[in-house]
Regions:
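Catalytic cofactor-binding cores of redox enzymes
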Residues: 84, 89-99, 111, 115-118, ...
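Active-site-proximal substrate-binding core of FAD-dependent oxidoreductases
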Residues: 79-82, 193-204
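A glycine-rich dinucleotide-binding beta-alpha-beta segment and adjacent secondary-structure elements
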Residues: 102-177
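Short C-terminal domain-edge/linker segments immediately following a structured domain
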Residues: 66-71, 184, 198-202
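An anion/pyrophosphate-binding glycine-rich loop and adjacent beta-alpha core
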Residues: 1-106
Length: 204
């Protein structure tokens, strides 16, 4: 969650739109922004290929590119319209911060139905816990598809890759974390495994 933050472009492939969030050090932006995440299980993926998660990611990113009309404009929808299943035609009190502009419409067209359903269920629940989180004219800007790795590098009980000795897959890129805190925690655990493998003791 980024207080006083901005939604930024994070695309790395031609023809795909990817969003992310950040704050500058003064956290003085007009908005707060937060990524909305949904579980994706192996049975949800389009096929059994090891890169099926990457394919799902690309489908969403390409759909967002098309929904934005090209030029890496991001699709956007008001929360109230999203919950009602209605495309948005204009913004409200909350101004979007995505730097390449937004195209008002329907972000749900960029996502699989099971993710849309999860988000529609979660937003009102979040609003009950965090007042204003589901306010009707809050802005959904899509899509954030890079919060977690779509693949996982398998590691053994010693923390090393099962295929390459001496390699410790760690954090988000290896598929073991989905954010700053979980990545830091995984890094600490991996560091302990490295010290143990090198014959050192680990203080508790």
């Amino acid at each position: 969650m980024c207080p006083g933050g901005y939604v930024v472009s994070a695309a790395s492939e031609r023809g795909g739109v990817v969003t992310n969030g950040m704050s500058l050090s003064d956290r003085a932006g007009a908005n707060a922004n937060s990524g909305l995440l949904a579980n994706v299980f192996p049975d949800d993926l389009p096929g059994d290929d090891v890169l099926a998660g990457v394919e799902l990611q690309r489908r969403c990113e390409r759909a967002a590119f098309a929904a934005g009309g090209g030029a890496y404009v991001a699709p956007a929808q008001l929360v109230g319209d999203f919950l009602a299943g209605t495309p948005s035609s204009a913004g409200g009190r909350v101004a979007p911060t995505y730097p390449r502009s937004v195209a008002w419409g329907s972000v749900e067209k960029c996502l699989p139905d099971y993710i849309v359903g999860t988000l529609r269920d979660a937003l009102p629940r979040m609003g009950r816990q965090l007042h204003g989180f589901d306010v009707a004219d809050a802005v959904l800007t899509g899509v954030e598809t890079r919060s977690s790795s779509p693949v996982r590098v398998t590691r053994g009980a010693d923390g090393q890759s099962v295929g390459v000795a001496g390699l410790w897959p760690v954090g988000e890129g290896a598929g073991y974390a989905g954010g700053i805190m979980s990545a830091a925690t995984d890094g600490i655990m991996a560091a302990r495994k490295v010290v143990e493998a090198l014959g050192g003791g680990v203080a508790e």
